[in-house]
Every structure is written in structure tokens, then in C-alpha cells.
Amino acid sequence: MAERTSESSSESASFDLEKQQSNHHDRYQSSVSSELEESLKKYPVISNPQDFIVTLDGPDDPDLAVNWPLAKKLRNVAVMGSACLCAGFGSSIFSGAVPEVMVKFHVCRTVALLGISLYVLGFASGPVVWAPMCELFGRRRPMIIAVFIFCIFHIAVATAKDIQTVMICRFFCGFFGSSPITTVAGSFSDMFSARTRGLVIAVYSAIIFNGPLMSPIVGGFIGKSYLGWRWTSYITAIMGFTAFTSMIIFHRETYTRTITEIRASKVRVLTGNYCLHAKSEEEPLEFSYFFHKYFTFPLRLLIFEPILLVVSTYTAFVYGILYGLLEAYPVIFGESRKWRLGVESLPYLAIFVGVCIGCSSVALFQPYYFKKMDENKGRPVPEARLPSMMIGCIVFPIGIFWLAWTGNYPWIHWIVPTLAGSFIGFGIITIFQQTINYIIDCYSGCSASAIAANTLLRSSFGAAFPLFTTQMFNNLGIGWAGSLVGFVAVGLIPVPFMLFLYGPKLRQMSKHCLKD
């Protein structure tokens, strides 16, 4: 029942786009030249075109991703998760290569750090392309192609002879690596109903954050070892090719539109009737139409949807802090406490623990969400996702202030600022994962584009923060630099509470949001 209601809400959310498609198609048909019109008289006119449209067999069709066996869904989740892990892992493993890159190419630390920032900037620009691609061609094909090219560019980084090649290739690593990160949330929306989606998104969120958290530790020890900085990229490429191979073997298409087109193609071959087609195949092949409907849609959502803009800005700040910590921890534990490269990254493990605790806490709030869904006749209730985020938004600044003022004094035992990371990790993951759930529930009819808009904004912050974090902590001092970030986090605490109170009214005013 939940799957049917979710599907009906998706149809209502995309009604305006379908109407626009129909109007555009009518104008296209009316522009046929008179010469072509004359030649068309030789061919019979189909009086019942609806009879030639191939559709799925209702909401219970076994080919629909939401109706797949659980084992098949989990297999898809595993291979997509591995691709996301590679993309996140590659973003910050380069931090371990920074000292050697500075020496090898005779550049300052800020220039070397561009290897991280340009990668995350690729994360920001990629969704503008990958979200439309996954709406046009399905989730599988664009993702597989992107993961393969992602691996090729990592090999190019590893074999680069100059700093320009390193930076350009790092950008394209992020650009193509953003494909699975952008696509996966939409694919989860295809496979899981609102009732079960929360736990899957929790796993996805853990992958998104734990990749960047674990890779600096690996990168630090690799950069210091006999392998050298180039192996930070070789290892990421090896991981990527493993994920690529797994996707080719095990991954299956989840997007309903593409599944219908695949069925139509099979039916044409089996029947020999090449008039048979899916409704989506009637779209006019005009660039202006596709550009307006697909390529600008994430940007329009971000600009004109207040809910999406507010939660994406909050997520962007949190994501920026995550990448800012990649530079703050070397200052706190490396420069201040004189820890060596590799060892100075070990406190990231505390953030990792906090992320894992935050993910497991989702299960505690599931009964509350189920209760609200049952009260709403089985329909999703986006605001019921927010209580755990309310806790996270309070815990997050506590961790920031704790880290700032205990890390400020080297004579305080190292375990004290290290433990602050668990609070930061808990806050980051609860804010992030419930934001993703909230967006998917609100924009179920265009979830891939909404997540793309969110990814674009948060990755822009992630690219910017590492560039000024080191200077900020050196100039303001660890205590006040951390406090500045903490005060901003405190200022954002009201966001989930305001959405909990006024979210339903804002959704009623939206063109694309789920209505009560």
C-alpha cells in the first residue's frame, strides 16, 4: 500500500512536466513542412495510437524495482555503495600526498590543497550533468560509464608529470565520481518505500562520510611509506575498477521509465511490431526541450524551492566542516602536538565512531515514523524524519566547541579533543541522513534532481572550506577559529525545529513537494 501511495505522489509531482512535454510535442508536430505532409499521404494513419504504447502491469509488476526480492535490492545497494565509497575515499586520500606533492612540484601548501578542493568542486559541478542523465537514460548506464572514466583519471593523476595535470585530472575524478553519489539516492527511492528507505539512507550516509574520514589515515601512511604519493591514486583506481566490475555483473536498472523502455524494446523484437513503444519514447528530440526539462531543473528547484534551499544550505555547511576538519586536525594534532604524518590522522577514527553511532540511532526513531505514516493513511510524513536531526543539531556544536578549546592546549591529554570527534561525527551524520530522507519524502516525484541540487551546493562548500581552514586556525588560534564555526552551528539549530512546525505549510505552497 505504501508503494502505491508513493508512486501516486510521484505522478502528481511530475504532472506539470508531462503536460509541458505534451504541449511541446504538439508544437513540434504542427511545424511539419508542407512537402513532408504531402509524402505522408502514402502511409496509413493509426487511429488508435494508445494501443501501441507498452506499459508495466500496474503497481504489482515484478519488474518494478520496488517489487524486487530483498536479496536483489541489497545486491544493488552493495554495488552502488561500493562505487560511492570509492568516490568519497578518493576525495580526501590526497591529503596524505600533500607534503610530498609540495616537494615534488615546488608548490606551496595552498596550491597542493587544490587537489582536494578541485576534486570536491568536481562533485559540485557533476550533478548538473548526472541528474539529467539518470532521468534520461536510467540509473545504470551513466553510472557505469562514469565510474570507469573516474578510474582512468585516477591513473592519470598517479602518472602525472606536472602539477597542472594533477589538478585538472583531480577535478575530473570528482566530476565523474559524483555520478554514483548523485544517482544512488534516486535509485534507493525507486527500490524502497518510505517505510524502509530510512535505514537504507542511513547506510548510504555512512558510506558518503566514512570514505573521506578513513582515507586520510590510509593516505597519510602511504605518503610517508616507500610507495609514495602516487599510490594514493593507484589504490583508489584499483578500488574503482573493482566497483566497476561488480556493477557490470550485479547491478540492475531501477528507474521505472527505463525499465518500461527496455520492456518495449523486447516486445518489439519478439512481436516484430516496431510501432510498439513506451510513452517516454515519444519525447521530441530537441535540445531546447531536454535542456529545459532536465538540465536546468535541479538549479530551478534549488532557487525556487525554499525547503530545498534551506536544508541544502544546512547540509552544505556540515559537509564543508567535514572537509575543513581534514585541515584542522593536522593543525591541532600535527603542528600543535608534533604528531607525525599518518599518526596525526588517527583521531578521525573518533568521528568515524560517531558516524556509526548516529547511523544506528535511526532505528530508534523508526517506530515514531511508522506511527506518523499510519496516521497519514500510509503516506510519507517528511516532518517525522526530523526528531533525530533535532538532537544532532544540538550535539554538533557541542563537539565543535569541545574540540576547539581542548585542542587549543597541548598539555591537555590527546584523548580529550579526540573524543570530541565522536560528538561531531554524530551531529554530522544525523543532520545529513535525515536531510536526505526529508528531501526524498518531500520531492518524491523528482528525487534525483532534488538530491542533485543538494549535492551541488554542499560540494561547493566542501571545495571551499579546505582552502581557508589552515589559515583561519593559524591566524585566529585553534580555540577561536573553532568557536567561530561553533557559533554558526548554534545559529543553525532552529532549522529542523522550524521545518517541523512550518514544513507542512511550506509544502502546500510548493509546485513539486508532496502535499498532505
Curated annotation (Swiss-Prot):
PROSITE patterns in UniProt: MFS
Modified residues (Phosphoserine): 31
Spans traversing the lipid bilayer: 77-97, 111-131, 143-163, 166-186, 198-218, 231-251, 301-321, 345-365, 386-406, 412-432, 439-461, 481-501
CDD domains: MFS_Tpo1_MDR_like
SUPFAM superfamilies linked to this entry: MFS general substrate transporter
GO biological-process terms attached to the record: spermidine transmembrane transport; spermine transmembrane transport; transmembrane transport
Membrane topology per record: Multi-pass membrane protein
Ranges of compositional bias, category Basic and acidic residues: 16-28
Keywords for the protein's UniProt record, in alphabetical order: Membrane, Phosphoprotein, Transmembrane, Transmembrane helix, Transport
Entry-linked Gene3D superfamilies: MFS general substrate transporter like domains
Primary subcellular site in the record, as a coarse category: membrane
Record-linked Pfam families: MFS_1 (PF07690)
GO cellular component: plasma membrane
Subcellular locations according to the entry: Membrane
GO molecular function, one term: spermine transmembrane transporter activity
InterPro entries for this protein: MFS (IPR011701), MFS_dom (IPR020846), MFS_trans_sf (IPR036259)
Highest taxon above the source species: Eukaryota
Region annotated Disordered, chain positions: 1-35
Family: Belongs to the major facilitator superfamily.
Protein name: Uncharacterized MFS-type transporter C530.15c
